[in-house]
């Protein structure tokens, strides 16, 4: 047995240091925390080669007393707390005494500090935090900490850092932005020195400003667009009694005013005021930047109920007593625990919803350009010029139909009062006779149409509820009444004709002639697709027809369409199964009640079909005997299947076995192992898969599968053509977005965006657009460029070569759809095998670009209980 022994102090220090400082972001965060705790109002951070060479953090804080030089970089030496109980009352960002000690363990650390300028001391520390050298220098009051050669003694981390230092620098800037926004009294300056020695200003804020000004300084002039100040109070005093025994034993807790104040800025709920991503969501607790995913999720859910296409920009600070939170959770102290979190989230959600309910909805107003207005005027003039020749004759028809409709209480349109009275399905007459798809085709674009009143639709005797329709105002006085049929689909105009509907009914209502024991009989019947052939009494049938005709005359246009569809469905060929008895509305039919027909009677046969029935007793007995035998066989097979099911259940009493049995997993490699059975309905491929003695049956959509393969092929190999601009267009970006562009130039070039990087310009203004992608009539602009930046930031970085903006993705999806195997095409086995095997090469083979699933599981063949139900009588 291996002997237990103690790890030496140096190795322990190296192990624990790697847990505290994990990347560039945590290293910079610890330095900023120390500067803020030192009461500094000016913090300057200088990166050399994006932090790959060194990081320097300078402040004008209190400085370090010479008596503390020896303990400055030792593990767990701090001036913030003296005992564990102090953690619940700590007001500083740091308190554990691990930051500088951990930095010594993974990098080279030097400190320049003074409390009485201009004389200052420069201190250098070794890996365990001991002073190796002390020299005298000069500086203003404050402290400068220099961290160089980060992760120099950790080969794996150093190699990873050298590969991803720009990406880590971008993440680090996001953290610094969070500090700069909430600390309005501190001036932040962030610089980067390139390997060539050029110093670039990346981020800067003003001292003694406000959160509003800091947001504008960090994110530019448009940073405050759509934001609104918020000040909410969450009253949790009703929950104090429940918390007293569950969360704390402090008797003074009952005297505490348990209210949380939420202050800051959040996006308005109007469309266009939010953002397309969650890149600007910051939560603070007592001005401490934290990662509070639960609260942010609540904000996003509430915002989605008002604006379901965007995400809110969130800058919220929670002010509450320190005794109600626990910040000692993770080494970076960015994850906190909140007492009675569920109640806090529920009250916050309700309060935020009430806040948004009080807001007024602000819609962006679209202003038409002068060219659009002129084009609409020309269109409207041409339309009315074309109609002027037939206007007089239409007016005559209009007045005639108007008078007739008024006398018969039919529908008419009153253009002055905006009221439509509609009954009995009479058409409305219009001066325009065209098959227009919508009103704007005639009267112009949305710039000339205002919807400010309602049109009341009175159905008269119809049972359809009253509808309110928007009225339309135009400058033209020629529009009086609108014909509803002008806006209907021409294909359905013939269907709704009453004459044709009645003619179809005559075909359906022809009598049926049949022969029983040599005598011919005639009966009226109705043939429907749902019920088959149904016999009805003469009086009842005539009464029903009268009711149907009356109801048809009073029905609406929609009812006429539905009726016509049902009529067409009724006249479809129906296969009559002689094993199924004909349905009859009468309880019994005696032979004497049938009307005998003479031998010389001439008549038309119903669809040329003759129904022959042999009603002999012998056949009935034979059928009954066969039915009993079949029923016994079916019952026996059912019992055997039930026994197998019970046996399987008994074998799956173990939870793991049961879960494994009920769980079906399919990997991309399984597509290569699937065997093609055949094609179903000229649209689907039936395949089988054998895994662990299980035979699964799958159905594969031939069109969706081939479309997905073609789509991902286009995504991977297509390089978009681009159109050069006459003058290169400068692109104003935030520092983080610019770094994303610089780190992913091949992705933008593949999407057709040709860029030029001017290293002499300041950060945020170095990118210039040389050309835009082009494809026939599709236009691209800076919005697509910004969308591509967002998609790259959201991507995990594994397959960035396939990132495309939404317009290009839609074009690829359409091309892939049109070039794929269509539904209805017969396939041979070789083609079906190729389609199925291609799915194994795709990144995400489970859905086509339009969302259709490529495959579904049908059953496990081993558990198939055959078609026993089909043989039941």
Swiss-Prot record:
Name the consequence of residue 297 to E.
Displays a 60-fold increase in spontaneous mutation accumulation
* Effect recorded for residue 384 to V: In strain: SK1, YJM320, YJM339 and YJM421
- Subcellular location, principal: nucleus
**Matching PROSITE patterns:** DNA_MISMATCH_REPAIR_1
What effect on the protein does mutating residue 857 to R have, as reported in its record? Confers a strong defect in the repair of primer strand-specific 1-bp loops during DNA replication, but not during meoitic recombination. Does not impair heterodimer formation
Q: Where in the cell is it found?
A: Nucleus
**Which cysteine pairs are covalently linked by disulfides here?**
none
Annotated spans, DNA- and ATP-binding: 1-357
What biological processes does GO assign it?
meiotic mismatch repair; mismatch repair
The organism's superkingdom is given as: Eukaryota
Specify residue ranges for compositional bias: Basic and acidic residues. 379-402
Renumbered to this chain, the Polar residues biased-composition regions fall at 403-423
Q: What is the effect of changing residue 818 to K?
A: In strain: SK1 and YJM320; forms a non-functional heterodimer with MHL1 from strain S288c, resulting in an accumulation of mutations in spore progeny of crosses between these strains
Gene Ontology CC annotation, any one = MutLalpha complex
Q: Where is this region: Interaction with MLH1?
A: 661-873
Phosphoserine PTM positions read 393, 566
| Entry keywords, A to Z | DNA damage, DNA repair, Nucleus, Phosphoprotein
User: According to its UniProt record, which protein family does this protein belong to?
Assistant: Belongs to the DNA mismatch repair MutL/HexB family.
Q: What else is known?
A: Present with 521 molecules/cell in log phase SD medium.
Q: What does this protein do?
A: Required for DNA mismatch repair (MMR), correcting base-base mismatches and insertion-deletion loops (IDLs) resulting from DNA replication, DNA damage or from recombination events between non-identical sequences during meiosis. Component of the MutLalpha heterodimer that forms a ternary complex with the MutS heterodimers, which initially recognize the DNA mismatches. This complex is thought to be responsible for directing the downstream MMR events, including strand discrimination, excision, and resynthesis.
Q: How does it assemble?
A: Heterodimer of MLH1 and PMS1, called MutLalpha, which is the major MMR MutL activity correcting base-base mismatches as well as IDLs. The heterodimer binds double strand DNA independently of a mismatch with positive cooperativity and has more than one DNA binding site. Forms a ternary complex with either the MSH2-MSH6 (MutSalpha) or the MSH2-MSH3 heterodimer (MutSbeta), which recognize and bind to mismatch DNA. Ternary complex formation is promoted by ATP binding.
Q: Please state what the protein is called.
A: DNA mismatch repair protein PMS1
Q: Which gene encodes it?
A: PMS1
């Amino acid at each position: 047995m291996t002997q237990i022994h103690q790890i030496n102090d140096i190795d322990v220090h190296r192990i624990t240091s790697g847990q505290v400082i994990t990347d560039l972001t945590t290293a910079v965060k610890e330095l900023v925390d120390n500067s803020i705790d030192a009461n500094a109002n000016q913090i300057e951070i200088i990166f050399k080669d994006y932090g790959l060479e060194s990081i320097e953090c300078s402040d004008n804080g209190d400085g370090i007393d010479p008596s503390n030089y020896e303990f400055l970089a030792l593990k767990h030496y701090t001036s913030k707390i003296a005992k564990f109980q102090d953690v619940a009352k700590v007001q500083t960002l740091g308190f554990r005494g691990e930051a500088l000690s951990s930095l010594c363990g993974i990098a080279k650390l030097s400190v320049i500090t003074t409390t009485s300028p201009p004389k200052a001391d420069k201190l250098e520390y070794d890996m365990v935090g001991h002073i190796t050298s002390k020299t005298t220098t000069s500086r203003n009051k404050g402290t400068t900490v220099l961290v160089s050669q980060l992760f120099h003694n950790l080969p794996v981390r150093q190699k990873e850092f050298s590969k991803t230092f720009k990406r880590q620098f971008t993440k680090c800037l996001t953290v610094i932005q969070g500090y700069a926004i909430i600390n309005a009294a501190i001036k932040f300056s962030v610089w980067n020195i390139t390997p060539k020695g050029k110093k670039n200003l990346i981020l800067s804020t003003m001292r003694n400003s406000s959160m509003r000004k800091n947001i504008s300084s960090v994110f530019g002039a448009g940073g405050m667009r759509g934001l609104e100040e918020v000040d909410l109070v969450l009253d949790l005093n009703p929950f104090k009694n429940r918390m007293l025994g569950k969360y704390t034993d402090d008797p003074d807790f009952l005297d505490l005013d348990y209210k949380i104040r939420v202050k800051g800025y959040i996006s308005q709920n109007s469309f266009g005021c939010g953002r397309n991503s969650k890149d600007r969501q910051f939560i603070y607790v007592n001005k401490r930047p934290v990662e509070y995913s639960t609260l942010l999720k609540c904000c996003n859910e509430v915002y989605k109920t008002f604006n379901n296409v965007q995400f809110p920009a969130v800058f919220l600070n929670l002010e509450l007593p320190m005794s109600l939170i626990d910040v000692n959770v993770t080494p970076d102290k960015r994850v906190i625990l909140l007492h009675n979190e569920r109640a806090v989230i529920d009250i916050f959600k309700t309060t935020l919803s009430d806040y948004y309910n009080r807001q007024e909805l602000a819609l962006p107003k679209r202003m038409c350009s002068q060219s659009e207005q002129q084009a609409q005027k020309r269109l409207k003039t041409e339309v009315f010029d074309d109609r002027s020749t037939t206007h007089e004759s239409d007016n005559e028809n209009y007045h005639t139909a108007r008078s007739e409709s008024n006398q018969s209480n039919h529908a008419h349109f009153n253009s002055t009062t905006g009221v439509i009275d509609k009954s009995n399905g009479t058409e409305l007459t219009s001066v325009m006779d065209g098959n227009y798809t919508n009103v704007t085709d005639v009267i112009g674009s949305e710039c000339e149409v205002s919807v400010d009143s309602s049109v009341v639709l009175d159905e008269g005797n119809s049972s359809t509820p009253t509808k309110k329709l928007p009225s339309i105002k135009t400058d033209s006085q020629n529009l009086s009444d609108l014909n509803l049929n002008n806006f209907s689909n021409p294909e359905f105009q013939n269907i709704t004709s009453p004459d044709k509907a009645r003619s179809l009914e005559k075909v359906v209502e022809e009598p049926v002639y049949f022969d029983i024991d040599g005598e011919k009989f005639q009966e009226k019947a109705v043939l429907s697709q749902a019920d088959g052939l149904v016999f009805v009494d003469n009086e009842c049938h005539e009464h029903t027809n009268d009711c149907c005709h009356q109801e048809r005359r009073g029905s609406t246009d929609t009812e006429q369409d539905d009726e016509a569809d049902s009529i067409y469905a009724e006249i479809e060929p129906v296969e009559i199964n002689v094993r199924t008895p004909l349905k009859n509305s009468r309880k019994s039919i005696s032979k004497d009640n049938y009307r005998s027909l003479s031998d010389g009677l001439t008549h038309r046969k119903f669809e040329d079909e003759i129904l022959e029935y042999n009603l002999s007793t012998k056949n009935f007995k034979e059928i009954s005997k066969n039915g009993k035998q079949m029923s016994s066989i079916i019952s026996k097979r059912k019992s055997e299947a039930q026994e197998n099911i019970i046996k399987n259940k008994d074998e799956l009493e173990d939870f793991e076995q049961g879960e494994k049995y009920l769980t079906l997993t399919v990997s991309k490699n399984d597509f290569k192992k699937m065997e093609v059975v055949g094609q179903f309905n000229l649209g689907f491929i039936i395949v089988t898969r054998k895994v662990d003695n299980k035979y699964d049956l799958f159905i594969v959509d031939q069109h969706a599968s081939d479309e997905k393969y073609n789509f991902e092929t286009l995504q991977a190999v297509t390089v978009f053509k681009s159109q050069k601009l006459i003058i290169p267009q400068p692109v104003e970006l935030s520092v983080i977005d610019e770094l994303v562009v610089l780190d992913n130039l091949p992705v933008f070039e593949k999407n057709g965006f040709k860029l030029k990087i001017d290293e002499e310009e300041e950060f945020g203004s170095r990118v210039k657009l040389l050309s835009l992608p082009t494809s026939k009539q599709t236009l691209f602009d800076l919005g697509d460029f910004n969308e591509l930046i967002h998609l790259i930031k959201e991507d995990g970085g594994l397959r960035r070569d396939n990132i495309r903006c939404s317009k290009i993705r839609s074009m690829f999806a359409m091309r892939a759809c049109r070039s794929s195997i269509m539904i209805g095409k017969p396939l041979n086995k070789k083609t079906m095998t190729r389609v199925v095997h291609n799915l194994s090469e795709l990144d995400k083979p489970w859905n086509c670009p339009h969302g259709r699933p490529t495959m579904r599981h049908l059953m496990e063949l081993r558990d198939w209980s055959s078609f026993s139900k089909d043989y039941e009588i």
